[in-house]
Every structure is written in structure tokens, then in C-alpha cells.
Regions:
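Glycine-rich phosphate/adenosyl-contacting loop at the front of the ribokinase-like
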Residues: 2-84
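A structural signal for isolated positions on well-ordered beta-strands in alpha/beta enzyme cores
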Residues: 30, 84-88, 111, 125
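Short, glycine/serine-rich, charged loops/turns that create anion-binding
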Residues: 36, 90, 131
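A glycine-rich beta-to-alpha transition motif near the start of alpha/beta enzyme domains, typified by
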Residues: 89-105
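A glycine-rich helix N-cap at a beta->alpha junction
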Residues: 101, 105-117
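Conserved phosphate-binding/catalytic loop of the ribokinase/pfkB sugar-kinase fold
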Residues: 114-118, 123-163
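Conserved small/polar residues in nucleotide/adenosyl-binding loops
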Residues: 165-167
């Protein structure tokens, strides 16, 4: 069975993007976007809470990774492209971890503003399975910690102005 017309069109578009990207890896790619930390807490949910019918997660391990535009920047770097990311993090532990993770992988972080008294966005996912099952992990909860206020206008203008120099 072959591809549908829609699938064939998507296939051709993806191949055109790959061909374009592979033509010239010497150019700069500028990314402007949200920068966040993704956290994953894995464990077993064998019991229900005695006070409410919700699973009790017994943690087995945690993982952290950069998310959103930072994830794309790291991916481009791993493919051999010179990318530069522009965005903002808070002056907190999560922001410092993001910068450390990106710098460890060779991503240029000079376009990331560190904003005092701002919370870096952290998205935590709690995933669980039954201890007796080999597979079948399921998302129990996503817990977001993020700033309610937009990035200050002066910081946004500085990020945009700096990014334009690199285009």
C-alpha cells in the first residue's frame, strides 16, 4: 500500500527541508523563543492514597533536559549547524542548569538574557507504571512552574535587537 496524497506531499516537503539544510551548514541559524527546563520523574504507582483516590508515586529516577527553543538549538548543534539562541531565563537554579547544559554541548548562549527576580519556566512530568509490569509507563501529572508576567519590554527589545545583528 502506498502513501496517500497528503502523506506524499508531507514527505516531499520534509525531503525539501532536509535538502535545503544539507546544502549549506556554514550559515548561521538564529532561534528566538521560549527557553525552559523539562524534568521527568519516573516511578511506580502500585497504591492509591488513603485520603483521595489518586496514585502514590514511588520515585525511581529523575531526568532533566532543556526544552522548547533550547532543545531545538541543541539539536541543530548536534547536526553540525551553527545556531544562536535568543531568549530569557530567570536568575535561578533552573536558568543556570539550562545554560550549563547548553554550554556543555557547545551551544552559544550569549543571546540568552538572565533576568533578575524572574522564575525560569520548568515543566515537570510525573510518569508511572506498575512495578509488576515490564512496560506501560503513563503520564500521571504535568506540573508547570512559570512566570505569570511577560518578559519586560526593555529585555525583549534588547533580545530582538541583538538577534537582528546575527541574521
Amino acid at each position: 500500500m502506498g502513501m496517500t496524497d497528503v502523506e506524499l506531499e508531507q514527505h516531499d516537503k520534509l525531503n525539501a527541508i532536509i535538502e535545503t539544510l544539507n546544502k549549506d551548514k556554514t550559515g548561521n541559524i538564529v532561534l528566538i523563543g521560549d527557553i525552559m527546563l523539562d524534568c521527568y520523574i519516573h516511578g511506580y504507582a502500585n497504591n492509591l492514597n488513603s485520603r483521595a483516590p489518586v496514585p502514590v508515586l514511588r520515585e525511581t529516577h529523575r531526568e532533566e533536559d532543556v526544552g522548547a527553543a533550547a532543545h531545538v538549538a541543541r539539536g541543530l548543534q548536534s547536526m553540525g549547524y551553527r545556531g544562536k539562541i535568543f531568549g530569557a531565563v530567570g536568575d535561578d537554579k533552573a536558568g543556570a542548569k539550562i545554560l550549563e547544559y547548553l554550554e556543555d554541548e557547545g551551544v552559544n548562549t550569549t543571546g540568552i538574557a538572565i533576568i533578575e527576580d524572574r522564575i525560569t519556566t520548568v515543566k515537570t512530568r510525573m510518569l508511572a507504571s506498575r512495578e509488576s509490569l515490564v512496560q506501560g509507563e503513563q503520564l500521571l501529572l504535568r506540573w508547570d512552574v512559570e512566570e505569570d508576567e511577560p518578559i519586560p519590554e526593555m529585555a525583549l527589545e534588547a533580545i530582538y535587537d541583538l538577534s537582528l545583528i546575527h541574521i
